[in-house]
Curated annotation (Swiss-Prot):
This is ATP-dependent Clp protease proteolytic subunit 2. PROSITE patterns: CLP_PROTEASE_HIS, CLP_PROTEASE_SER. Its EC number is 3.4.21.92. Cleaves peptides in various proteins in a process that requires ATP hydrolysis. Has a chymotrypsin-like activity. Plays a major role in the degradation of misfolded proteins. It is found in: Cytoplasm. It catalyses: Hydrolysis of proteins to small peptides in the presence of ATP and magnesium. alpha-casein is the usual test substrate. In the absence of ATP, only oligopeptides shorter than five residues are hydrolyzed (such as succinyl-Leu-Tyr-|-NHMec, and Leu-Tyr-Leu-|-Tyr-Trp, in which cleavage of the -Tyr-|-Leu- and -Tyr-|-Trp bonds also occurs). It comes from Prochlorococcus marinus (strain MIT 9313). The keyword Cytoplasm applies. The keyword Transmembrane does not apply. Keywords: Cytoplasm, Hydrolase, Protease, Serine protease. Fourteen ClpP subunits assemble into 2 heptameric rings which stack back to back to give a disk-like structure with a central cavity, resembling the structure of eukaryotic proteasomes. One of its GO terms (cellular component) is endopeptidase Clp complex.
Length: 200
C-alpha cells in the first residue's frame, strides 16, 4: 500500500490554531526544498518557483536543497541549475541517498563550500543520454549534434565546478562513474561529508 505524502501540524505565526499541511510545504517554510524523484519539467518548474519565492522573501538566508534523485531531463535540470545561479541566496545542496546524472550535476552546482553529502550517499556522473526511437536519419543527426553540444557544455561546467580538468571529466563521464561521499569530496563534487544537521 502506498504511503502517500505525510501531513504534519503547522501553526501560522501569530495564530493559536494549528492546521495540517503536507511535509514538503512545512519544510518549505524553513527554506528546505527536496528533490526526491526524477528531474522532469514539472519538478523543475516547482523547484524554480520555490527558489524564486524564497529568494524574494529574504535573499540573505540560504536555501537548502536536499537531493535523492536518479537524474532525468537535461533541459529541466538546466532550468534548476540556472535558477540556482540566478538567485542571490546561497543554495546549500545536500545528497541523501543517491545523486545520479542530473542529480549529481545539481548537487555539485550548489554554493561553493556548501555542497554536502551524508556518509552513505552515492554520487554517479555520466554523459547525457539520448535515443533514436525509429526516426529519420536527418532527425537523428540533429539530435546527436545537440547531445554532443550539451555533453560538452555539461563537462565544461563540471570541470569548472569541481576543479578537475575537462579531459578527466570527459573520460570519467564516458560511462557511469559511481563515487562514495568521501570519494565525491576528493573529486570536488562536494565540499564536505556531514553526519549531523548542525554540520550543515
Amino acid at each position: 500500500m502506498p504511503i502517500g505524502t505525510p501531513s504534519v501540524p503547522y501553526r501560522l505565526p501569530g495564530s493559536q490554531m494549528e492546521r495540517w499541511v503536507d511535509i514538503y510545504t512545512r519544510l518549505g517554510v524553513e527554506r528546505i526544498l527536496f528533490l526526491g524523484q526524477e528531474v522532469s519539467d514539472g519538478v523543475a518548474n516547482s523547484l524554480v518557483a520555490q527558489m524564486l519565492y524564497l529568494d524574494s522573501e529574504d535573499s540573505t538566508k540560504p536555501i537548502y536543497l536536499y537531493i535523492n534523485s536518479p537524474g532525468g531531463s537535461v533541459t529541466a535540470g538546466l532550468a534548476i541549475y540556472d535558477t540556482m545561479k540566478y538567485v542571490k541566496s546561497d543554495v546549500v545542496t545536500i545528497c541523501v541517498g543517491l545523486a545520479a546524472s542530473m542529480g549529481a550535476f545539481l548537487l555539485t552546482a550548489g554554493t561553493k563550500g556548501k555542497r554536502l553529502a551524508l556518509p552513505h550517499s552515492r554520487i554517479m556522473i555520466h554523459q547525457p543520454l539520448g535515443g533514436t526511437n525509429q526516426r529519420q536519419a536527418s532527425d537523428i543527426e540533429i539530435e546527436a549534434r545537440e547531445i554532443l553540444r550539451i555533453k560538452d557544455m555539461l563537462n565544461h561546467s563540471m570541470a569548472e565546478l569541481t576543479g578537475q580538468s575537462f579531459e578527466k571529466i570527459e573520460k570519467d563521464t564516458d560511462r557511469d562513474y559511481f563515487l562514495s561521499a568521501a570519494e565525491a569530496k576528493d573529486y570536488g563534487l562536494i565540499d564536505r561529508v556531514i553526519a549531523h544537521p548542525n554540520e550543515a
